[in-house]
C-alpha cells in the first residue's frame, strides 16, 4: 500500500502486519527525523517530498541508510509543498488534492493587482503559479549516489504512450548507469527527444539543484509544449475552402505552410504552429511523411501562418505505435522457483517447486507410477525440458535437481500433468 493518512497506516499495520507499506510523497516527509520516525513505525519505503534537493536527499540517506528512499523524478510538480496544498479545496468546491481530485487551479491565469486596482502582471506571465515539469533523466547517477532506491515517475491518468515512453527512457538510463555504460551524444539526444514529445510544460530540475526561481516556472502556458522542431518559412493559399467554417468565415482560406525542420519528424506526428507575438493564436496539422532535420516540408493548414511561427511536435505517432505494440504483448511477471524431479522405478513420479525468494513456500505433486522403458529410456535432459515448460503459470524455473533411475520410461503428457498440478499446488500455498 502507498499511504498518506497516518490513521489508515496504523490500521493497516495492525490488521495486515505482513503487507508492504510505502509512505506517500503526500505525507510531506522532508527530513531525516521524519524518515527515521517512519522507519520506527514499520514503513518499508518512504517517498520523499518532491521539493527536496539532491544534497538534502543525501543528508536523509546518510542519517537513515537502512530506509528505502523513493524520489519523485519525472512529471508535474505543484506550486505548494507536497501534501500541504489546500488551494483546490478552497477554490474549487472542495476538490481535495490529497484525495486525488485536484482541479489544478495553479495552472489557471491570474491577474496581480495593487490596492488601487491597477494591474501589476507583466506581459507573458499570466500563469504566475504554474511550474514546469520535473525531468531528472540526466541526473540518475547523482540521485543514485545520494541514496535514492527508487525513482517515482508520474503515470496516473496519463495516456499509454506517455507512460511507455517515459518509463522506457528511465529504464535505459538506469540500466546504463548500473552497467557503467557511456551513451553517445546521438543516443542522449534521441532519449531527450522522446521525453519532449510526451506531454510536458517544458522541463526543469530546479528543485534537485536547490533553486526555485523563474527557471522552474511556465508563465506563458500550462498546456502541452511538446518539442520545438522547426519554423514556418511562409504559407500559400490552397485552392479550397476550409471545411466546417461558417459562411462568413470563408475568407479564412486553407493554406499550405512551408516548414524548415531542425529536428526530425515522423509520419502522423501532430504539429502545432504558434506565433510568438500572438501566443493564443495557433493551429495544428499532421506530418504527411517522415522527414529529417534540415528538410523543408509542406503541410496543409486551416489558414495561413506568418513566417517565423514556431513549430512543435505535440504528439508522436511513433510513441503511440510503440505503446500499442507493447500493450499487445503478453507480459507476465513470473516468480522464480527451484525444481526438484524424482523418478524412481516403481514409485510415483514427483515434482517439487520451491520459491527462490522464500524457501518456506514449497509444494509437491505426484502422479503416475514410474515403469521400466519399453523403447527409449528417458534422460534427465528430457525431464528438464518438459517440466521446465511452465506455460501460462506465474512461475519460471531457476534451477533443476533431477533424481532419475536408469532405464525409466514415461509419456511426456503425463509429466506435463504432474508439473501443472505442482504449479497449482504452489499457487494455493502462496495464497493460503
Predicted regions and their residues:
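Surface-exposed amphipathic alpha-helical tracts and adjacent flexible/coil segments at the periphery
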Residues: 3-4, 15, 19-20, 36-432
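Gly/Gly-Pro- and Ser/Thr-rich, intrinsically disordered tail segments characteristic of DNA damage-repair
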Residues: 16-32
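RNase H-like DDE/DDD metal-dependent nuclease/strand-transfer catalytic core used by mobile genetic elements
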Residues: 12
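Alpha-helix capping/helix-boundary segments
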Residues: 7-8
Amino acid at each position: 500500500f502507498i499511504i498518506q493518512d497516518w490513521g489508515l497506516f496504523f490500521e493497516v499495520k495492525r490488521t495486515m502486519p505482513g503487507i508492504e507499506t510505502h509512505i506517500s510523497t503526500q505525507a510531506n516527509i522532508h527530513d531525516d527525523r521524519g524518515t527515521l520516525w517512519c522507519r520506527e513505525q514499520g514503513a518499508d519505503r518512504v517517498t520523499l517530498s518532491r521539493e527536496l534537493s539532491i544534497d538534502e536527499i543525501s543528508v536523509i540517506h546518510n542519517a537513515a541508510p537502512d530506509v528505502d528512499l523513493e524520489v519523485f523524478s519525472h512529471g508535474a510538480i505543484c506550486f505548494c509543498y507536497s501534501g500541504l496544498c489546500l488551494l483546490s479545496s478552497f477554490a474549487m468546491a472542495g476538490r481535495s488534492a490529497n484525495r486525488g481530485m485536484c482541479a489544478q487551479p495553479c495552472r489557471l491565469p491570474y491577474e496581480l493587482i495593487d490596492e488601487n486596482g491597477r494591474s501589476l502582471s507583466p506581459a507573458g506571465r499570466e500563469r504566475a503559479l504554474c511550474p514546469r515539469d520535473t525531468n531528472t533523466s540526466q541526473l540518475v547517477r547523482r540521485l543514485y549516489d545520494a541514496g535514492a532506491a527508487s525513482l517515482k515517475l508520474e503515470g496516473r491518468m496519463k495516456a499509454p504512450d506517455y507512460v511507455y515512453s517515459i518509463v522506457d527512457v528511465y529504464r535505459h538510463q538506469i540500466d546504463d548507469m548500473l552497467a557503467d555504460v557511456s551513451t553517445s551524444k546521438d543516443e542522449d539526444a534521441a532519449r531527450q527527444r522522446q521525453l519532449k514529445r510526451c506531454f510536458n510544460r517544458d522541463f526543469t530540475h530546479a528543485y534537485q539543484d536547490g533553486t526555485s526561481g523563474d527557471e522552474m516556472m511556465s508563465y506563458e502556458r500550462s498546456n502541452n509544449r511538446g518539442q520545438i522542431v522547426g519554423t514556418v518559412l511562409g504559407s500559400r493559399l490552397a485552392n479550397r475552402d476550409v471545411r466546417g467554417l461558417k459562411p462568413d468565415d470563408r475568407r479564412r482560406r486553407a493554406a499550405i505552410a512551408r516548414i524548415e525542420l531542425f529536428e526530425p519528424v515522423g509520419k502522423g506526428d501532430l504539429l502545432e504552429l504558434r506565433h510568438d507575438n500572438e501566443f493564443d493564436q495557433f493551429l495544428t496539422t499532421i506530418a504527411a511523411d517522415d522527414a529529417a532535420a534540415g528538410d523543408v516540408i509542406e503541410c496543409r493548414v486551416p489558414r495561413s501562418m506568418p513566417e517565423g511561427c514556431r513549430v512543435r511536435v505535440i504528439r508522436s505517432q511513433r510513441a503511440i505505435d510503440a505503446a500499442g505494440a507493447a500493450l499487445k504483448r503478453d507480459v507476465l511477471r513470473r516468480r522464480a522457483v527451484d525444481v526438484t524431479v524424482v523418478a524412481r522405478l516403481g514409485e510415483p513420479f514427483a515434482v517439487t517447486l520451491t520459491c527462490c525468494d522464500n524457501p518456506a513456500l514449497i509444494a509437491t505433486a505426484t502422479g503416475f507410477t514410474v515403469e521400466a522403458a519399453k523403447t527409449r529410456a528417458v534422460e534427465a535432459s528430457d525431464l528438464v525440458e518438459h517440466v521446465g515448460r511452465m506455460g501460462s503459470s506465474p512461475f519460471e524455473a531457476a534451477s533443476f535437481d533431477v533424481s532419475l533411475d536408469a532405464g525409466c520410461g514415461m509419456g511426456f503428457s503425463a509429466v506435463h500433468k504432474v508439473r501443472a498440478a505442482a504449479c497449482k499446488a504452489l499457487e494455493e500455498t502462496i495464497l493460503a
